[in-house]
Amino acid sequence: MANRANRHAARTEDSDNTINYVQCDGLAVMKMVKHCHEESSNMDLAQGALLGLVVDKCLEITNCFPFPKSGDETMDEEMYQLTVMRRLRRVNVDHLHVGWYQSSDVGNSLSMALLESQYHYQTSIEESVVVVYDTQKSSRGFLCLKAYRLTPQAIQMYKDGDFTPEAFRTLKVGYENLFAEIPIVIKNSPLTNIMMSELNELLPEDKGHNFLDLGTATVLENQMRSLIERVDELYQEAVRYNKYQQVVFKQDTEKHRALAKLAAENAVRTSKGEPTVPEDEVIKQFRPMTAPNRLTATITSGQINTHAQHIAQFCSQSLAKLFITESLQIAKEAKEAK
């Protein structure tokens, strides 16, 4: 606890250097992957707790367990987590809570719920991270496991509860710096590496006939559908913000017109020796408009950026497969012609 207090005192507001990288045990990764894929079959969001410890600037994740899934509102999830960690402590297993994990569908991990949950975790447990596992991308052969932490600017903005455009400009917060990605490393014990080497020798050699498979239209279709939905949401947010700006502009115009009229009337009163009317009487008639919440639009912009990156990456891979397949087909036809 003393080490945590010292690290907290040394941290600056401008940069978050609490954690440099995350080291995850292979068994913990397998537990997360198994849980996320089981819940993805039911189209549910998988979430769980991460256990481990902090060594210098490295967050070591050595174990994890899923959050309870129950429709009973009387169930105390916090008590459940404390009970699990208490029992792990009895069997001499790392029981310190260092974060949480959740599954992701087609890369759509950034959300209001994720931001709020990580804020509460990071303000109560300084070193905590959120690990996001993309089930669909991993099922295609690309292990997608990423660790994130809220940036100091995002924490300050959420702590102030001010999500107006002025607050975003002052803190220089955008969708690209709400979260900071922390490098994650998977580590196995020497015995595990030996066993995996032996299993690798027992596995049959892959012929590689699926490497050039182009029948992945459903992946692109899901990404495009999600992208269209997010663009539509961002358009609605833009319409609301434009209406707010129009109302503010109209109010400012009327306010300046009223102040100009009052100034002319006060000039007449001054020439007649009568007392002038203070400008506060006019200003009180125009109450300041409440600025709309821009956090939703920022998160939606981040989701659009993520989908666009995934689509670009997927299309580049598909084009590469297409050109390679074309070259192989031409070579095959030339060989058969001989």
UniProtKB/Swiss-Prot annotation:
Gene this protein is translated from: eIF-3p40
Subunit structure, as described in the record: Component of the eukaryotic translation initiation factor 3 (eIF-3) complex. The eIF-3 complex interacts with pix. Interacts with mxt.
The keyword Transcription appears for this protein: no
Protein keywords: Cytoplasm, Initiation factor, Protein biosynthesis
Pfam families reported for this sequence: eIF3h_C, JAB
GO cellular component: eukaryotic 43S preinitiation complex; eukaryotic 48S preinitiation complex; eukaryotic translation initiation factor 3 complex
Compartments reported by the entry: Cytoplasm
Name recorded for this polypeptide: Eukaryotic translation initiation factor 3 subunit H
PANTHER family (alphabetical): EUKARYOTIC TRANSLATION INITIATION FACTOR 3 -RELATED
Family matches, as HAMAP family: eIF3h (MF_03007)
Cross-referenced InterPro entries: eIF3h, eIF3h_C, JAMM/MPN+_dom, JAMM_MPN+_peptidase_M67A, MPN
Family named by the database record: Belongs to the eIF-3 subunit H family.
Chain's role: Component of the eukaryotic translation initiation factor 3 (eIF-3) complex, which is involved in protein synthesis of a specialized repertoire of mRNAs and, together with other initiation factors, stimulates binding of mRNA and methionyl-tRNAi to the 40S ribosome. The eIF-3 complex specifically targets and initiates translation of a subset of mRNAs involved in cell proliferation.
Main subcellular location: cytoplasm
Residue stretches making up the MPN domain: 22-154
GO biological process entries: formation of cytoplasmic translation initiation complex; positive regulation of Notch signaling pathway
Gene Ontology terms, MF aspect: metallopeptidase activity; translation initiation factor activity
